[in-house]
Amino acid sequence: MYYKGFDLKVVPGKIVNEEIDHRFACYAESDDGITWRKPELGLVEFQGSKANNIILGSGPHGPLDVDAARFAIFKDTNPATTSDARYKGIFRSNKPQGLIVLKSSDGINWQPMSDAPVITDGAFDSLNLAFWDEYRGEYRAYWRAFEKPSIPVPHSNSDGMRSIRTATSPALIHLSPVQALSYTGPVNPVDL
């Protein structure tokens, strides 16, 4: 299981800080889905020690500035994937802003698949997803953005209405033109 971890400083009733460099992607294992082990991976230093289960910390990774708390990892079932990319993860990059793709042979040690974000048009402030779509034979990504509404909407964010976008790719690097999801039925301009 992959999950996000935070090193938050709190006082009763409030969070004192939630800085980006205190966010982590973590890993745990289970044989039954009930009892979990957090293996000591020795990858990322936290509070002076690498004896932890952190697979990736937020901050610079080559030319990318990874936000390790906004990610989705999947086991790649594409029959053509190489052994060094059996696992893939889509992470948010802060500078440059966008979504980046990392690859791993074991789901623990990660390397960027490119030096720049593969998706740059969006908000990227929610759970961003990517996966191999075996029925269509391509990768698919979903992420959140803001769209300007066609009609005035009370209590709307000044950036527009929340929306979900998607794109596809044969290799998860160069994606098709971005499409906003549309919904059938009565129009109800409510934020997603």
Each model region followed by its residue ranges:
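Beta-rich carbohydrate-recognition and catalytic domains
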Residues: 2-128, 132-192
